[in-house]
Amino acid sequence: MKVAVIGCGTIANAQHIPAYCNNKKTEIKYFCDIIRERAEKAVETYGCGTAVTDYREVLADDEITAVSVCTPNKAHSEIAIAALKAGKNVLCEKPAARLYSEALEMQKAQHETGKVLNIGVVNRFNICVNKIKELIEEGALGNVYQVYVSFRSHRSIPGIGGDFTTKAVAGGGVMIDWGVHFFDIVMYCCGDPSTKTVSAEKFSYLGNPIEDYVYTSMWAGPPKKDGICDVEDGITGMIRTDGPVITFNGAWAQNIGENEMFIDFIGTKGGIRLQYGADFTLYSTKNGMLTKTEFDMEKPQMFQTEIDSFVDCIESGKKLPSHIDTNIITAKMMDAIYRSADEHKEIIL
């Protein structure tokens, strides 16, 4: 199966390209990036493919079966929709798009073409996450009535001044970058409950002005001190669903002592704390005593599993849990979070 990677930045080089190279069924024919040097570097590094700068050239090639869209968020919907209409199967990095309306257009194109459109919500391929989903479905926690989500860092604004902190490119800040992963886990494990109301507030203090931002290291750096930082570096709020009430606190940068990256699933019979990217602990009772069970599970290569599953579903026609139809539920909720924060009022859905 011949594939192409559109967008040859950090996530493509760290995950998508190596995963395709490790999959015996796939051959990368094109590396595409508007910055030619990036595409050429990929050809040189991986010893395969052709470097191009226009994704339309990729889509015009009938030999291409599938593409990974790893561009900045602003290009996701345009490229994914064009690829679907050109008869290609698509794995689009998260978030699906900058805006809920764009994600809906992507879903519409998928329904019209019948091609695969999966979103890069990679935690749905995490063994720990799937075990939590299983435990909740089995009733181990009883009624899960509350979920608390924390994705807070002391100093982690990525590439400040660049694409990540430019609203016109990214669509938002920490919520659309980190929050999308955490909320996707919550929705997936809790059976995709419908959102009823959302109340949120967002903050942008530590990244403005850019020249005053103090840090020790920076992912996706170096900083562009003459660039733009017009997105939130912090956000908090509450969501009512027809399942649990979800409260959350997220920040790229916050004056706290330690990073806090976890999700608490709180039920009537038990509770689970998932440390993001690590293991989880189940708190319950048995024989009149409080219990604490630590689950230490195999750490899978989630991106490899994601790519392998994408390739397999193209061949089998099986619908994956990362399909656009499931992701659109989270996209709608996140849209309401931003609307609430922008308008300083509760949003009723």
Give residue ranges: language-model regions:
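Beta-strand-loop-alpha-helix segment that lines the small-molecule cofactor/substrate pocket
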Residues: 65-66, 72-73, 77-124, 139
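N-terminal Rossmann-like dinucleotide-binding module
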Residues: 1-46
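C-terminal helix-rich "cap/oligomerization" subdomain common to oxidoreductases
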Residues: 66-69, 112-115, 287, 295, ...
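Predominantly a Rossmann-like dinucleotide-binding segment in NAD(P)-dependent oxidoreductases
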Residues: 11, 123-226, 344
